[in-house]
């Protein structure tokens, strides 16, 4: 039982050391990855969403293919039961 506890503890310490070493090597990698994800994400939002969810009212209409929801006052896609 003592041997298995010793091996488990040694394995956890080894895992910690390996993770710490790889993290210190690649400190900039997560920042670069996140910035590239958010940069690509903002590019797709314009094409994908159009003006879905934008605020609208009597004076400011919606993009083509969307209607202003009278209840929520934002742009939605027209569908059955929507006015």
From Swiss-Prot:
Main location: secreted
Keywords: Cleavage on pair of basic residues, Disulfide bond, Knottin, Lectin, Secreted, Signal, Toxin
A molecular function (GO) term: carbohydrate binding
Keyword Secreted: yes
GO CC annotations on file: extracellular region
Superkingdom per UniProt: Eukaryota
Signal sequence, renumbered to the chain: 1-21
Residues cleaved off as propeptide: 22-49
Disulfide bonds: 51-63, 56-68, 62-75
Subcellular location: Secreted
Tissue: Expressed by the venom gland.
Domains (record comment): The presence of a 'disulfide through disulfide knot' structurally defines this protein as a knottin.
Function: Agglutinates erythrocytes.
Family: Belongs to the neurotoxin 10 (Hwtx-1) family. 51 (Hntx-8) subfamily. Hntx-8 sub-subfamily.
Name the record gives this protein: U5-theraphotoxin-Hs1b 2
């Amino acid at each position: 039982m003592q041997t298995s506890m010793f091996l488990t503890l040694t394995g956890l310490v080894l895992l910690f050391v390996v993770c710490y070493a790889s993290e210190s090597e690649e400190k900039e990698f997560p920042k670069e990855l996140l910035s590239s994800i958010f940069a690509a994400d903002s590019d797709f939002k314009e094409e994908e969403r159009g003006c879905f969810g934008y605020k609208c009212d009597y004076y400011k209409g919606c993009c083509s293919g969307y209607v202003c929801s009278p209840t929520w006052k934002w742009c939605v896609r027209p569908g059955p039961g929507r006015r």
